[in-house]
Amino acid sequence: IAYILKAFADSLFGNLMTVDTAAWFESFSMTSYSVIPYHIIVVVGTLLTLFLGARSIEKTNKIMMPLFFIIFLILAARVAMMPGAWEGYKFIFTPKWEELIDPMTWIWAMGQAFFSLSVTGSGMIVYGAYLSKDENVISVSQHTAFFDTIAAVVAAIVIIPACFAYGTDVGAGPSLLFVTLPAILQDVPMGQLFAVILYAAMIFAGVSSLQNMFEAV
């Protein structure tokens, strides 16, 4: 989240829209202690939301998350028009059936599912404690899994085709968020505004996850 806060700040002031994103990310991530101020801000900010009440984060997320989806759909349309994007779609949607017989495929998939849904963490326990007794747990769980999967697919159809269009390694990890995504935003109208909203939405989503970790402690 500290890295995302850095990206948000540079988007807000326009710096991220005018730099070589790969050089920007490398300079920041490889500089000793550069992330500490942002990390402190994130930790203190999260603690304040817990002390002062987390309802504001919940209300904000109800606005930011739909905006997040809308902007990603706009970016998906832009990426679809880039040369080489089709190779990205083939990479995503061409099944490799032989991989299903590899036990590690299932282990990685289950690990990703557990992490993404906070099944093995404190998230379900903490937020479940606040759940109304009138809620249908099975129905809510189904909705959570469904929308989590939709979010992953939407992100994939933006990032992966863009990797092929820009010649970026699809297995690059965090740099996809801080190199590939900003590069796309530099190429679209109102890219700076979209960048500010996207990274702000990611911060709110991240803080909502940190809240349950801190509260469990």
For each feature predicted by the language model, list its residue ranges.
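Inter-helical loop and helix-membrane interface segments of multi-pass membrane transporters/permeases
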Residues: I1-R55, G84-I107, P174-F178
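Membrane-embedded translocation segments of transport machinery
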Residues: E58, K62-Q211
